[in-house]
């Protein structure tokens, strides 16, 4: 009998992507995050779909519809907690996935990397518009402050802000359109993720050594399917622990109060996964400068392949670059902490130093370290 998975037009694609795919034999647990992100996306789309069945995107009823979901809908509290904390798990996996790419030089697959950066931006946009939907205090003021940054654009700024708002303030029109964006974007992300995979399978996976693994490859199934299954179990365990035992751990208490345009919260801050970028934004006293720094903090990822100076692809055998990479990691954690603090000393100066170090590390120190390591490895006789 002819093997259907190798001949059927649809099954053939699945077979070449997830079953008979030749995979390097030495990829570590850091290569699990792609499948974990796929799982996160599926969880978010499913929980989001069921939440959307009960949610109303109207300023008068949005807040109470979320309360209704939690109180009156069967397992509505679980859906909401999984969706809110699923976003946190999503970003956790995203940051680790990007970090893995930087550490092991995966960014040298330029098409895959660039689509990945676009995916990161799309997920950030989805999370941002989704945060307005519960119509709590922090939802309202967070959306007001961040959308208002568009007004820093010379000449067209103010017009642009009012165009995004659909009026002169964040109101019903804004909520309705943000709900529409929040619904459509995950499907765009799914399409982009497919393209991301398509480009990856053109070249094959990178591996911890950063060398050509063609001489030693194994089929994806059963080796990596079982490995991915273990990762998924651990992800689900962590998500359930978070959603069932401390669902409000990562949220803001201000969001338990309905949105009130007449009362500003003492500290306006976004969700934890945006705090590093928010800290960079706040560290520059000029509005336009801050907005440009905010954009640069993410878009800098696009030029990382151009800044690769080392002869070795991976950082596995490059101690100087490794040290700088872990300093960058610590720096991002510091920025995340600063983003959640009030604008006063010593937080201002710490934020400014950390922001400066962030760009200095990526643009200057890491490329220099790569060049120095090349020099050190050159035969001296």
UniProtKB/Swiss-Prot annotation:
Q: How is the cofactor bound?
A: Binds 2 heme b groups non-covalently.
Segments spanning the bilayer are 33-53, 77-98, 113-133, 178-198, 226-246, 288-308, 320-340, 347-367
Cytoplasm found in the keyword field: no
Note whether Electron transport occurs among the keywords.
Answer: yes
The compartments listed are:
Mitochondrion inner membrane
What is this entry's stated membrane topology? Multi-pass membrane protein
Its GO biological process annotations read:
mitochondrial electron transport, ubiquinol to cytochrome c
Listed under subunit, the entry gives: The cytochrome bc1 complex contains 11 subunits: 3 respiratory subunits (MT-CYB, CYC1 and UQCRFS1), 2 core proteins (UQCRC1 and UQCRC2) and 6 low-molecular weight proteins (UQCRH/QCR6, UQCRB/QCR7, UQCRQ/QCR8, UQCR10/QCR9, UQCR11/QCR10 and a cleavage product of UQCRFS1). This cytochrome bc1 complex then forms a dimer.
| Additional record remark | Heme 1 (or BL or b562) is low-potential and absorbs at about 562 nm, and heme 2 (or BH or b566) is high-potential and absorbs at about 566 nm.
**Member of which family?**
Belongs to the cytochrome b family.
Protein name in UniProt:
Cytochrome b
Name of the encoding gene: MT-CYB
